[in-house]
Amino acid sequence: MPLAFCGTENHSAAYRVDQGVLNNGCFVDALNVVPHVFLLFITFPILFIGWGSQSSKVHIHHSTWLHFPGHNLRWILTFILLFVLVCEIAEGILSDGVTESRHLHLYMPAGMAFMAAITSVVYYHNIETSNFPKLLIALLIYWTLAFITKTIKFVKFYDHAIGFSQLRFCLTGLLVILYGMLLLVEVNVIRVRRYIFFKTPREVKPPEDLQDLGVRFLQPFVNLLSKGTYWWMNAFIKTAHKKPIDLRAIAKLPIAMRALTNYQRLCVAFDAQARKDTQSPQGARAIWRALCHAFGRRLILSSTFRILADLLGFAGPLCIFGIVDHLGKENHVFQPKTQFLGVYFVSSQEFLGNAYVLAVLLFLALLLQRTFLQASYYVAIETGINLRGAIQTKIYNKIMHMSTSNLSMGEMTAGQICNLVAIDTNQLMWFFFLCPNLWTMPVQIIVGVILLYYILGVSALIGAAVIILLAPVQYFVATKLSQAQRTTLEHSNERLKQTNEMLRGMKLLKLYAWESIFCSRVEVTRRKEMTSLRAFAVYTSISIFMNTAIPIAAVLITFVGHVSFFKESDLSPSVAFASLSLFHILVTPLFLLSSVVRSTVKALVSVQKLSEFLSSAEIREEQCAPREPAPQGQAGKYQAVPLKVVNRKRPAREEVRDLLGPLQRLAPSMDGDADNFCVQIIGGFFTWTPDGIPTLSNITIRIPRGQLTMIVGQVGCGKSSLLLATLGEMQKVSGAVFWNSNLPDSEGEDPSSPERETAAGSDIRSRGPVAYASQKPWLLNATVEENITFESPFNKQRYKMVIEACSLQPDIDILPHGDQTQIGERGINLSGGQRQRISVARALYQQTNVVFLDDPFSALDVHLSDHLMQAGILELLRDDKRTVVLVTHKLQYLPHADWIIAMKDGTIQREGTLKDFQRSECQLFEHWKTLMNRQDQELEKETVMERKASEPSQGLPRAMSSRDGLLLDEEEEEEEAAESEEDDNLSSVLHQRAKIPWRACTKYLSSAGILLLSLLVFSQLLKHMVLVAIDYWLAKWTDSALVLSPAARNCSLSQECDLDQSVYAMVFTLLCSLGIVLCLVTSVTVEWTGLKVAKRLHRSLLNRIILAPMRFFETTPLGSILNRFSSDCNTIDQHIPSTLECLSRSTLLCVSALTVISYVTPVFLVALLPLAVVCYFIQKYFRVASRDLQQLDDTTQLPLVSHFAETVEGLTTIRAFRYEARFQQKLLEYTDSNNIASLFLTAANRWLEVCMEYIGACVVLIAAATSISNSLHRELSAGLVGLGLTYALMVSNYLNWMVRNLADMEIQLGAVKRIHALLKTEAESYEGLLAPSLIPKNWPDQGKIQIQNLSVRYDSSLKPVLKHVNTLISPGQKIGICGRTGSGKSSFSLAFFRMVDMFEGRIIIDGIDIAKLPLHTLRSRLSIILQDPVLFSGTIRFNLDPEKKCSDSTLWEALEIAQLKLVVKALPGGLDAIITEGGENFSQGQRQLFCLARAFVRKTSIFIMDEATASIDMATENILQKVVMTAFADRTVVTIAHRVHTILSADLVMVLKRGAILEFDKPETLLSQKDSVFASFVRADK
């Protein structure tokens, strides 16, 4: 065919120049080529030489660090320019196709312009990244020339009467506007940067974020193209495939996205709302307004992107309609009408009537639609993440000011706060993600219905009505689904609570043979949970069924109705497949409706919770007395502490309405020697609850400065409450508290240090920091060293002194990593005594002037207590003139006290020195003296020295105790430490990256059973085959409608043709009905499969764990086991079934679509291969990165929630130390770490979806082009073209979901893998050699114990802890066992219950070798009380007698023996009174007494007490000892002594050392031997 730039026709007007060259169209087109050629020739050398790639003087880790003015506008204009140029090229090709010869000038200039536009943006990007703006002069010239030449062309078109009816005229006008705007952008860069025409160019600094090498999240800084396509993630995804992603890889957040920045933005919004709404500044409405004020703009941007994406989504059906309609016509060639300038220009209608043009437009619309959609998702999620971080920071700041009483027994619990942080903030985040749907869904529905009506007419309203009318049903199902989920969550929480209790008390359960009771208790709750899960599965399957069946039903009703009621209008392929695509679009927002409504309701509830939390009571500063000395004496040196609790919901009490006056009146009334006192309380009444009875009444005390003050009293008299009241943690009803303002806050610490500030910033308290060690040790999940130093500067000498004073060095030596060992959450890897000593060590290490110690000796034996008292409290603190307040039951230390405060029933019984008590409180003093039974100080020091001298080696290492008090001897320390390091090394987390866990997948599916699995596979395959058959039949049916006349259809009568149509409709109806039924079958099958697997795996796991040996629980972290029952079971219960359904559906839909396209156009297979290779590598790289980022998102959320939990639990300690600001800084770090992981995960998901959807768009383009080509050559019907295009769009929609679901399934199958790993745990051997019939029912009835050559170890790989022990215990004897830590005392007691490996020797009880007994029989016939009290949530009756074997009288008798009868009678419900989880509503001593009562209930002939009275005061302990001796006079009692004096009345005393019996005789005999070890113990305990 002839080819020339201006054409080859001799008569062509293109060569005429008689009216001037500018009136020659070909010349004007040639003139338009000049600017483009100029740019290409100028820029290519610069790009290749490397001007644009040179880096700036500021060296940073990536290049895109600077944006010139108008950066985004330039990119937007360039994209529009490229689109218009593509249209111009296409228009030129179509216009040129009319004539025989080819006119290159119609499309070649546009092609050159397209190349130049791409070159311009590449050139600009390189100039921008190199920060060399002077080179932009080339673009300035180019835009000027292009604008001028294109303007000339536009004017000449107008002169030759070429107007809006010709598309070329419209495109030229748009190009003039675009070139002009780009020229203005370039001029604006000159104006701002002044790189030419000005003497002094304006320097621009790089963004502050990018000067920090740690900022690697580049989304805010890259150019617009990279932002839209997430191109910058390519390098990150590629790197992630080579090495694991960790926090160092994702580094820091940009400043604008950090929690502190967003928190400040939120605070500004809250302040603005507070000024507007003074009545309820923390109300729900005010919170919503503040959130919208702070984050609303980004939400509007996301909504704009979403609306644009939804509107562009309708391009697919419209283009399908146009393409199929064009191919369905007989004549595909339009006839030319009029020529202008020697050529013919097509109109817009002719342009849009071309199938190839529509295919290209469909491709571009899909690209743009997917880009806008992903941009909307990203902006919404980013906004939600920023909002979440801001709210979490605000919650934390509120916690720092909350009343302790409100946390401990008020409206807000620690669990509720953690839920607020972990759940409610996420609810708000996801609401912001779904929020744009609230206003985009109506737009999508309205436009969809209008287009359906335009294409189908009235019959379209039938199908639309079906979809819309079923929306309330969907909402109803979604509501029921939400209710079922909520009920499931309640039962799940109850089950986890019971499981947690069961695991924490596993040692007690095994010792008491209660495993089956608590296992049944968990199974009962699990059955309730499974009932809820079945309801959840039913509604989920209905929801899935409706999602898949409604489009089929709508299409069926619409099309059958169309041919039935509108017989004059046939169902053409263009109408059918365009309508089919529109129905799929229309269904989407209605599916989302239920999710959006649920999310909105949840967000409203969450904001209400947040409002209640933010409005809760706070501790606020009272007005303080002036710091200057008052005119009268030195009274002004005392200031009020911040004790006032402000409740924003209630008016302040009248008694504390104005405390400034009373305080100023009270302050001068102090004695003149006020400077000698640290703190003084006058007439104080304190309570825990706002309206409760005062816990402390009429408190008037003075704590001397620089001296040791001891607070003593019986259990529950208010000693700990007094400390907390002094620290300002209780609600003060009346009275005043004064702190000496001249007290230095700490030694060597600048009082103006910013670290001393509280989290509130401006709310600085007058009291200085107080080193506080609570009765219940509070530890961080950090190293031992970090817990002791507590973020204070490390002082090696002082650190060693503190370690020595607390006797921690032996314990540190056996830890896997010494003092760098992570101690676990709540110090779970340590024993009670170790936790207590680390807590005390923290208080000793701090250089504060005031130290409060709340019962630090409770979990320590006599030697540790004496050493701590002497080396720690006396030498480190008192001798250093620091004020020490010590709460204790150890009355033998009273002579060391400078000041004593005696409490009774919440009041001060007496305060003074010990001599004061001797003079004025003779009876009380004599009582103390009896309890103390002390000898003079010189003898005590002498015996201590003798004891130290008698030790074979000083500092003998003690074995590390487990959380249940397990004691190992020193010989196994090395081995145990090595094993601990190998099995549970919390100090270093090994990042393992596995491939797709196919084995776990096989185990999951095989757990469902062969029948259910077969049904699942068969129904899924059959369903998708039927769905393809429906659409294929529709193509055949609509193709038949293209034959216009009955004759052409080979029908003699019109009735026959109607019959033909009815056959098509009938078959279509049958196929659709079968498809709907199969949708129901598959949805039910997949959910029931998930239920069966969940039920089977949980039952297997529970049975395996409950039967596991105690060694398993001692070497496996409790949190790890609990996670299997919580998160992993939840994943299997609720997530895997839905993910499995989505994965199978999306995969089979993609396979079906590709199969149909390949069938329609086999040549598509050629293009499919490279696309498949690209998809494979994308999914391969994405899965690895997604798995790492998902795990990182989860692992960074755990420390965040744990930090909140730690803060709530240790709030008193944090506020006492004045460490609010430090902990808030940690919170910001944890929040930012979690947010950066979430943002990278979001960006990775967007990267995947953009890649896969762009590939999907390529599939659509290739499928469209090949289908059109085949159809034009009469090789393909229009119906099959429509079928192929519809399925091509389906690939575009489901390709990314397939990869996403595959990645999700890979992560979720990890739960199955972990559970199966636990199922391999070996169970204890519960079976015995003796048949139950051979064991007497009342065995053991005498209590005779024979121990013959007994050797015991904890594991076959470890060395013995008891060696060749031989002894005889006669019936009814009372045996006392003592020895140093690690001597084997507890191992001796555990041997009776076969809790340890008795590899040699035997124990014979009443003539029966216990090794031959079934474990349950043995353990149920003995009784033991452990050192650590264990109580379970439930009634007192359940805790005493879970087997329900005893009468009420027996239970009351046991309570009376344990000194608890009066306490329980005072409770509402008596024996049915509720004990909270862990017995938190009782004191430590009372919990231990309940455990004693529980043992008394069993009434066995052998009774073992393992340091059972450690947490009880001496008076109560003495009473109990007498009661035990009386109540168990005829029983054998083995007592392991914590306080040696408690076994002085025993018949025999056994002293153990290194697992062997050192001494065994009557206590009188051993005491008479001055060199006996027992005698030295007694002297030290006095």
Swiss-Prot record:
Glycans are attached at residues 10, 1050. GO terms for molecular function: ABC-type transporter activity; ATP binding; ATP hydrolysis activity; metal ion binding; potassium channel activity; sulfonylurea receptor activity. Mg(2+) binds at residues 720, 775. Residues 939-950 have a biased composition (Basic and acidic residues). Residues 299-602, 1013-1307 form the ABC transmembrane type-1 domain. ATP binds at residues 688, 716, 720-721, 1483. Residues 48-72, 124-136, 187-303, 373-438, 474-541, 593-1013, 1085-1143, 1176-1249, 1298-1582 are cytoplasmic. Keywords: ATP-binding, Cell membrane, Disulfide bond, Glycoprotein, Magnesium, Membrane, Metal-binding, Nucleotide-binding, Receptor, Repeat, Transmembrane, Transmembrane helix, Transport. Disulfide bonds join 6-26. Its main location: membrane. Residues 679-930, 1345-1579 form the ABC transporter domain. CDD domains: ABC_6TM_SUR1_D1_like (cd18591), ABC_6TM_SUR1_D2_like (cd18602). GO terms for cellular component: plasma membrane; protein-containing complex. It is found in: Cell membrane. The keyword Zinc-finger does not apply. InterPro entries: AAA+_ATPase, ABC1_TM_dom, ABC1_TM_sf, ABC_transporter-like_ATP-bd, ABC_transporter-like_CS, ABC_transporter_C-like, ABCC8, ABCC8/9. It comes from the Eukaryota. The chain crosses the membrane at residues 31-47, 73-89, 107-123, 137-153, 170-186, 304-319, 357-372, 439-454, 461-473, 542-557, 577-592, 1014-1031, 1068-1084, 1144-1161, 1163-1175, 1250-1265, 1282-1297. ADP binds at residues 1381-1382, 1384-1387. KATP channels are regulated by cytoplasmic ATP/ADP ratios; ATP inhibits the channel by closing the pore, while ADP activates the channel. Activated by phosphatidylinositol 4,5-biphosphate (PtdIns(4,5)P2). Residues 1-30, 90-106, 154-169, 320-356, 455-460, 558-576, 1032-1067, 1162, 1266-1281 are extracellular. It is a multi-pass membrane protein. Regulator subunit of pancreatic ATP-sensitive potassium channel (KATP), playing a major role in the regulation of insulin release. In pancreatic cells, it forms KATP channels with KCNJ11; KCNJ11 forms the channel pore while ABCC8 is required for activation and regulation. Belongs to the ABC transporter superfamily. ABCC family. Conjugate transporter (TC 3.A.1.208) subfamily. Forms an heterooctamer with KCNJ11; four ABCC8/SUR1 molecules interact with one KCNJ11 homotetramer. This is ATP-binding cassette sub-family C member 8. It comes from Cricetus cricetus (Black-bellied hamster).
